[in-house]
Curated annotation (Swiss-Prot):
It comes from the Bacteria. This is tRNA dimethylallyltransferase. Belongs to the IPP transferase family. Monomer. It comes from Ligilactobacillus salivarius (strain UCC118) (Lactobacillus salivarius). Substrate binds at residues 12-17.
Length: 307
């Protein structure tokens, strides 16, 4: 039996946190952070971590679970998510995953089998190969590749369900057997509804710049100095945007204003990469609540139909 999961994605500063709270209240949900940096304690400002006041009485998971010296891999993310989703569902609540690292979310939803280094290398390489093939040749050509290898499986998978087509190709390569002859457990694990938030680029970049200014006012530089004093970029948590840009400033190599501009530039670039990832690799239904707040009704309708 598949577990329904709502996933809210999109770049920073477009309202994902507020939407997640609204959905959790309306549909009896609990929230899992999908951000690989929000797992770290004492990194609240630079990670745009939800505040206790914003949480209200909605339970949140995968926030403040590690020290900055501890590593957090995609395998750790999947393990934690699966446990949290199970706990939420067992309490008759809907799991809601918010924001996050695109590859981590995709790995969870596409049902990677965890197996240490083998998982990290071979599975990722197979997946990336077929993703690149699709980006270059299109969904139809991708589906045709599956049809050449396993026509029975291809007839059962719609062309537009490229995630499933890629999964089938990956399994065939991994096992050397037809996908249609195998019991693929990932197919039964999750039934995600992917909701994406975005807005026009000029507005998005303006909101990102403003958010960085607010972060500076509320203590981002002090947070970066905390990481710097512990080891900076040598720490698992020390390479995040919003922190690493200040290390040259602390070393006297650039000015504070230059560091702040680097944070803004890197944040904008990351937002662009996020959008490219989610659009190319995940089946997301997009909304712009910044310019069209009334679209919240369309989101509720989408959820009602999905439930």
């Amino acid at each position: 039996m598949t577990q329904k999961v709502i996933v809210i994605v999109g770049p920073t500063a477009v309202g994902k946190t507020a939407l997640s709270i609204d959905i959790a209240k309306k549909y009896k949900g609990q929230i899992i952070s999908g951000d690989s940096m929000q797992v770290y304690r004492n990194l609240d400002i630079g990670t745009a971590k939800i505040t206790p006041d914003e949480m209200g009485d909605i339970k949140h998971y995968m926030i403040d679970i590690l020290q900055v010296q501890q590593r957090f891999s995609v395998a750790d993310f999947i393990d934690n998510c699966r446990k949290d989703i199970k706990e939420i569902a067992n309490d008759d609540n809907i799991p809601i995953i918010v924001g996050g690292t695109g590859f981590y979310l995709q790995a969870l939803l596409d049902g990677y089998s965890l197996g240490g280094d083998t998982f990290d290398q071979l599975s990722i390489e197979r997946r990336k190969k077929w993703q690149l093939f699709m980006e270059k040749n299109g969904k139809e050509k991708l589906w045709e590749e599956l049809a050449k290898l396993d026509i029975v499986a291809a007839r059962k998978i719609p062309i537009n369900n490229f995630r499933r087509v890629i999964r089938a190709l990956e399994v065939i390569e991994q096992t050397g057997r037809l996908f249609s002859e195998q019991h693929d457990e990932s197919n039964e694990e999750f039934e995600p509804l992917l909701i994406g938030l975005n807005t026009q680029r000029s507005t998005l970049y303006e909101r990102i710049n403003k958010r960085v200014d607010i972060m500076i006012q509320t203590g981002l530089i002090e947070e970066a100095k905390y990481l710097y004093n512990l080891g900076g970029a040598t720490l698992p948590a020390g390479k995040g945007i919003g922190y690493k840009e200040f290390y040259p400033y602390f070393d006297g190599e650039i000015s504070k204003d230059e560091a702040i501009e680097l944070v803004k530039r890197n944040s904008r670039r990351y937002a662009k990469r996020q959008l490219t990832w989610f659009r190319n690799k995940m089946n997301v239904v997009w909304f712009d609540l910044v310019n069209n707040p009334e679209d919240i009704k369309k989101i509720y309708k989408l959820i009602d139909d999905w439930i």
